[in-house]
Amino acid sequence: MGGGHAPGAGHRATTEFPPGWSPEQILAVLKDVANDPGEPRRRQYNGRWRCAGERYGVQVAVLVNSDGRVHTGYPLSGHGVVRNPDTARDPANPTVADRAGNRISYFTDSLLRLVTTRVSATDLAHYRELQWSGEWEELADTLSAHFTHTGFQLTPDEFADFEKLLNSFETPVPDCTYLNDRDHTLATVRP
């Protein structure tokens, strides 16, 4: 639990819990949603479980590892939830991290547009949710697992964007097995 969605954290293209929510309250809400979600749990391609529910007027999603540990949690919508801009803090002087963020943002959006009609509506909604909330590593990991496990046939354009997306991340990323093994993933799905 890194606190990237805490109020005022300011991470690029990331949703934040409402102002005034303490780290303790956020953690309690995430644990509560993980244990008692408001909708059926859904197993993701990378093995995590997606749990979602509303607490205190805020729609929250929590991803739980197969061992029961909370991997991440984030607000989706509700009173006081904000999403930070998808831009560099100082666009005139972008940092290396800003440039990586630009690549990740662009190739994520492009790839999801390309596969929109070829993935289920439920999967696409989850992928857009991860993109909206700023969970880019998780999105790359679960897309990698999806494409690897299902034999999803990428077109050359889709593969090019997917390869550029995966290569935009510094690895290893904690608990992102498929993203961390990107060479194998790319070899498996290469058209």
Which sequence ranges carry the predicted segments?
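Compact soluble domain cores
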Residues: M1-E54
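Histidine (H) residue identity feature
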Residues: H5, H11, H71, H79, ...
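General structural signal for secondary-structure boundaries
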Residues: S22-P23, S77, S120, T155
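Active-site or metal-binding loop neighborhoods of secreted/extracellular toxin and effector enzymes
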Residues: Y45-A97
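C-terminal-biased regions
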Residues: T95-P191
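Short linear motifs in intrinsically disordered/low-complexity regions
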Residues: A6, R12, P37, S66, ...
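Amphipathic, positively biased hydrophobic alpha-helical segments used for protein targeting
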Residues: E39-P40, G68, N84, A145
